[in-house]
Amino acid sequence: MTTAEHLDAYLKAMGNRDVEGTKVHMADNVVLRSPIVPAPFVGKERVADVLTQLLATVDAFEPKLLLRDGADFVAVFTIRLGDHVIDGMDHMHLNDAGLVDSMTVAWRPLPSVVAVQQKLAPKLGGKAMMLVPADQSA
């Protein structure tokens, strides 16, 4: 399977909420850096658990675009949770076998990210955070 085929299949599986289908395209030592909690998630099973919890929490995950530069890819997607719409990008790196070995996630806008973080972080062992305007902080 070529690297492009791995990434296309990975994103299709995400769009179909098929976490088992994503695992075929991940290296055993994959690292996920997420906006949900500060510490990275390491290992295929742990990353798959994070994806399972994410997809169970959000209403929709919609892949939009895939950009490539060598072994580095950027996947552009939309996440929906209630009235919140998140524009997201995953920077993914592929190892020599063509498997995803690194993912760094960026989401916007911040209020929508916090809405997802509040629901998802406790499921992953993290703490829910609040977004407080500067003039209302202690």
Regions found by a protein language model. Give the residues of each.
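C-terminal and inter-domain tail/linker signature
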Residues: M1-A138
